[in-house]
Amino acid sequence: MKHAIRHIHFVGIGGSGMSGIAEVLFNLGYRITGSDLADSATLRRLAGLGIGTFVGHAAAHIDGADAVVTSTAVQSDNPEVLAAREKRIPVVPRALMLAELMRLKQGIAIAGTHGKTTTTSLVASVLDAAGLDPTFVIGGRLNSAGANAQLGSGDYIVVEADESDASFLNLLPVMAVVTNIDADHMETYGHDFAKLKKAFVDFLHRMPFYGVAILCTDDPAVRDIVAEVTCPVTSYGFGEEAQVRAIDVRAVGGQMHFTAQRRNGVTLPDLPIVLNLPGEHNVRNALSVIAVAVELGIPDEAVQRGLAGFKGVGRRFQSYGEVAAQGEPAGSFTVIDDYGHHPVEMAATIAAARGAFPGRRLVLAFQPHRYTRTRDCFEDFVKVIGNADAVLLGEVYAAGEPPIVAADGRTLARALRVAGKVEPVFVDDIGAMPQAILDNARAGDVVLCMGAGSIGAVPGKVVEIAAAASLPQQTTRTRRKGEAS
């Protein structure tokens, strides 16, 4: 980046993608400021690093900035954007700034409708275990680093490639993973699935001639594009044709054990793997990491250590531990938090929970995300949500969208009742969800909180309320009228 750029301001700095880029640039020596609509733990953490943060948007916040970075959530009439344009300060989309960062290193980009954050985190963890000290920008908090971004001294940068707004077409990686291609964010592609698949092909063709595409051929849509990809391809999955393949897959508590067969280029010895994550979908994510490791020549021992020692990502099957159950019988229930909000993600996570906690009643607390997704995936939501043993259903988190008739939480709850597999409890106000969980969960249950909206605050609140309820009652009380002292 030209050294005339010294001060970079972020509009919407509290977002997971924006905060990560801001932190890396700050650690590169740039002066960073940023604003967001509401205060958050992310804003407070960035302020603790020395980044100037503002709650709310105002033209004065961009004073002195040489460039202004925006996310797709920021509207064109935002006062900071308008002020920047009036002053002829460059307004840079988030993806272009990420692409600029990637020019500094060898870029590994993780794309796909589902699994990007977990896979990016696993790649970063294995590179770190190999002593390669990667830079990474992730859409979730990597627990081992305590952050969603890190500036490393090594040659590689690992990032998520976002297809939701087609911004991944701005990136120029040297290696790219595609985990899957599913019908989500279809408004970006004119509700044309063929256009979505073509965008992934175009993304892969952004790589240089020496680039490598690592593709999950278990996914039908990914299989469809393989013939169109002109760069070298390494396939992975459970199928016999996959060059990096998992066999002998089994769940052991909250972990997955399997053997990786590697036949990309030369046949390598089978590699026994312990993955510190549940679910077959995460085995596939790990296979892509193993394929990356083969391409980079990472020793097997580092791969095994990075996957077995993986400490997880915030809001990706994140355990909040045991919470005391109310009522009888006495005991506790387990609380798990997950960001999944698409039916495919939810089905995989529910299956992972069944595997990790066999024989236990599964209570799903779900907040749908976006009216358009609820409308477009309505029947799939009914099928998937019905796989839980009990359901607490919140109202749709709008994410800025106007309501759509018959695509709201109450209508979804009625459809679940008609389907007859489960009797949902509709919780209109997400603020009431923690108490609803405590009222409905029994000893021995697993409570799985899912959604991409404000439900992320619910698991912590459940723990907080339960802990307060278990405190010893105060020994002093106000005397009733007439009571002897």
Curated annotation (Swiss-Prot):
GO terms for cellular component: cytoplasm. ATP binds at G112, T113, H114, G115, K116, T117, T118. It is found in: Cytoplasm. It comes from the Bacteria. GO terms for biological process: cell division; cell wall organization; peptidoglycan biosynthetic process; regulation of cell shape. Its main location: cytoplasm. It is an enzyme of class 6 (ligase). Pathway: Cell wall biogenesis; peptidoglycan biosynthesis. It catalyses: UDP-N-acetyl-alpha-D-muramate + L-alanine + ATP = UDP-N-acetyl-alpha-D-muramoyl-L-alanine + ADP + phosphate + H(+). Belongs to the MurCDEF family. This is UDP-N-acetylmuramate--L-alanine ligase. It comes from Variovorax paradoxus (strain S110).
